[in-house]
Amino acid sequence: MSDQRSPLERALGQLEATLDQHLDDLAALVRIGGISAEPPPNPTLVRSAEAVVALMSRAGLHGARVLELEGAHPYAYAEWLGAPGAPTLLLYGHHDVQPVG
């Protein structure tokens, strides 16, 4: 039996099915407490980037790794190679938090 739902309905269904895990992942990232206002080197931002890389790997992205550049905060990097020629969506978000106040 094929799924007759629209792409949006399928996406919303997937979100509903995995929302608790996503919230747990987000809470874990916030608990790391990496603050980008603190200058590099910043060990908590490295831990935050490593946590994002682990999430990327779990999601099936390829080549997930932390990129560290001199004088800059770490970047979480990965590639999606699973569907050549398919539409691609990139969601960019900072993996740091801001200090209280």
Descriptions of predicted regions:
Residues S2-G101:
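Acidic/His- and Gly-rich active-site-bordering loop/insert found
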